[in-house]
């Protein structure tokens, strides 16, 4: 062959090899596509690793995670569908209280970004429990924490964070501008109630799933206030109690029935010798029971129970094991206000079981220190001070504060009963610890169980003063 023929022959062979290679690649692509189609069937998800897709459907968050493994899409998780929290079950039978959470927020806040708060409480949906709290619009160990002993200011807001976590700007959700608040879930959405404004003209702003649905104006112009713990939802309706009037005398108390954030009914209690503040409420067999604070003249706690039509009964816990603070030594109780050391008080709770009652209270008679749970088997109706169980929660040497009830519905736990739980606020700083310029709190919580529990002390544990205090 001459040189030109050699070049033509080599070129022809190269072109032929290239065409064959191209056909093989096309065949390979067709084979891979066919194999992928067979594996995924009718799925049309893109093959992106760890793609998180969140959609909002009928007031329900639907959260899917698609994980790509070897060209196969695997769906992880399940739809978080809406339910209606019935509240028709009875309280679970319990023998004691198991530690549930401890957020250590003040200890963490000495070095981290943690909100200055008070009045924390817990509420659960059918999917999760959350901690709600009233922030002061300031962080611990910062100059704006100065003066946060004040209860009512325009900087306070209701916020929430995952249960057991220290409340910070990074994990917390804004709920409402408020210096008094409540919140609860009906199975379809969160209802929040935030009260803010001047003492003589405060307004409660109701939100459902974050949208303002109604407002309630102070009707006595004497510091409208609400529970500082969860409201109660039964069969799609939610219930809360508000107070307006003196803290040291007869005031006005109203029960509100709320559906999807709209007030559908309200009544004023006819309770001339009673005083209701900061009620801790829970559902039990379709009715609502609230145990409250008498800041006027009772060292035992007043209660009100009502059905979904707001037909109600009222009374005081009769036990000689007194639940308020300050209070006298245990002795002879009364089904009316026990007026010895009856002035002032602290938010608290109890759980009624027939004629018996679990009473949560500070260990100290005078100071908000320590905390204990006492089972009085006849204390709802009898006036003696005999009890059969006492469980220590916080030692008398450590600070406590407000306490309140919350429940876990069968839709969350899978039980056939409503689980009773409670939280305790552990207040630090002013007015009792005057080496600081601030007031804040951490919290612990417990749930009722019918098994072994521990007697111990779970105190706040922060070492004061902080750097900002020096």
Curated annotation (Swiss-Prot):
Required co-factor(s) are: Ca(2+)
Q: Which cysteines are joined by disulfide bonds?
A: 92-417, 124-129, 184-231, 233-238, 279-292, 281-290, 318-335, 421-447
Q: Which GO terms describe its molecular function?
A: exo-alpha-sialidase activity; metal ion binding
Amino-acid positions noted as binding Ca(2+) in the UniProt annotation, renumbered to this chain: 294, 298, 324
GO BP of this protein = carbohydrate metabolic process; viral budding from plasma membrane
Pfam families for this protein: Neur
Region Involved in apical transport and lipid raft association: what ranges?
A: 11-33
Could you tell me which residues belong to the region Head of neuraminidase?
Answer: 91-470
Topology in membrane = Single-pass type II membrane protein
Sites where a glycan is attached: 44, 58, 63, 70, 88, 146, 235, 386, 434, 455
Write out the GO cellular component annotations: host cell plasma membrane; membrane; virion membrane
Region annotated Hypervariable stalk region sits at 36-90
Subunit structure, as described in the record: Homotetramer.
Entry note about domains: Intact N-terminus is essential for virion morphogenesis. Possesses two apical sorting signals, one in the ectodomain, which is likely to be a glycan, and the other in the transmembrane domain. The transmembrane domain also plays a role in lipid raft association.
Q: What does this protein do?
A: Catalyzes the removal of terminal sialic acid residues from viral and cellular glycoconjugates. Cleaves off the terminal sialic acids on the glycosylated HA during virus budding to facilitate virus release. Additionally helps virus spread through the circulation by further removing sialic acids from the cell surface. These cleavages prevent self-aggregation and ensure the efficient spread of the progeny virus from cell to cell. Otherwise, infection would be limited to one round of replication.
- What protein is this chain from? Neuraminidase
- Organism for this UniProt entry: Influenza A virus (strain A/New Zealand:South Canterbury/35/2000 H1N1)
Query: According to the entry, what is the taxonomic lineage of the organism?
Result: Viruses, Riboviria, Orthornavirae, Negarnaviricota, Polyploviricotina
């Amino acid at each position: 062959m001459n040189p030109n023929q050699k070049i033509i022959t080599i070129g022809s062979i190269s072109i032929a090899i290239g065409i064959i290679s191209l056909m093989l690649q096309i065949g390979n692509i067709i084979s891979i596509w066919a194999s992928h189609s067979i594996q995924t069937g009718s799925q049309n998800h893109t093959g992106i690793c760890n793609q998180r897709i969140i959609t909002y459907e009928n007031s329900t968050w639907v959260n899917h995670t698609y994980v790509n493994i070897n060209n196969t899409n695997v769906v992880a998780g399940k739809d978080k569908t809406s339910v209606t929290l019935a509240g028709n079950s009875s309280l679970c039978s319990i023998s004691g209280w198991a530690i549930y959470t401890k957020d250590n927020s003040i200890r963490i806040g000495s070095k981290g970004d943690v909100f200055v708060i008070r009045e924390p409480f817990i509420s659960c949906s059918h999917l999760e429990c959350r901690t709600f709290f009233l922030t002061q619009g300031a962080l611990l160990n910062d100059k704006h924490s100065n003066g946060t002993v004040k209860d009512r200011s325009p900087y306070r807001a209701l916020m929430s964070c995952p249960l057991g976590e220290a409340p910070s700007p990074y994990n917390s959700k804004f709920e409402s501008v408020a210096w008094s608040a409540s919140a609860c879930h009906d199975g379809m959405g969160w209802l929040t109630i935030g009260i803010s404004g001047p003492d003589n003209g405060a307004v409660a702003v109701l939100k459902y799933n974050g949208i303002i649905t109604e407002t309630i104006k102070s009707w006595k112009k004497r510091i409208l206030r609400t529970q500082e713990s969860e409201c109660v939802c039964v069969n799609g309706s939610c219930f809360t109690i508000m107070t307006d009037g003196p803290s040291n005398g007869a005031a006005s108390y109203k029960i509100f029935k709320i559906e999807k954030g709209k007030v559908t009914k309200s009544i004023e209690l006819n309770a001339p010798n009673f005083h209701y503040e900061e009620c801790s409420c829970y559902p039990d067999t379709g009715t609502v029971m609230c145990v409250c604070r008498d800041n006027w003249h009772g060292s035992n706690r007043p209660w009100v129970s009502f059905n979904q039509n707001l037909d109600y009964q009222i009374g005081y816990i009769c036990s000689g094991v007194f639940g308020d603070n300050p209070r006298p030594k245990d002795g002879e109780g009364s089904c009316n206000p026990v007026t010895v050391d009856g002035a002032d008080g602290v938010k608290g709770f109890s759980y009624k079981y027939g004629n018996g009652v679990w009473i949560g209270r500070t260990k100290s008679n005078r100071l908000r220190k320590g905390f204990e749970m006492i089972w009085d088997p006849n204390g709802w109706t009898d006036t003696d001070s005999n009890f059969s169980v006492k469980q220590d929660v916080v030692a008398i040497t450590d600070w406590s504060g407000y306490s309140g009830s919350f429940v876990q519905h069968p839709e969350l736990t899978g039980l056939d009963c409503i689980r009773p739980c409670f939280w305790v606020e552990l207040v630090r700083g002013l007015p009792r610890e005057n080496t600081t310029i601030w007031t804040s709190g951490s919290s612990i919580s417990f749930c009722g169980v019918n098994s072994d529990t521990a007697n111990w002390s779970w105190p706040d544990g922060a070492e004061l003063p902080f750097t900002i205090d020096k």
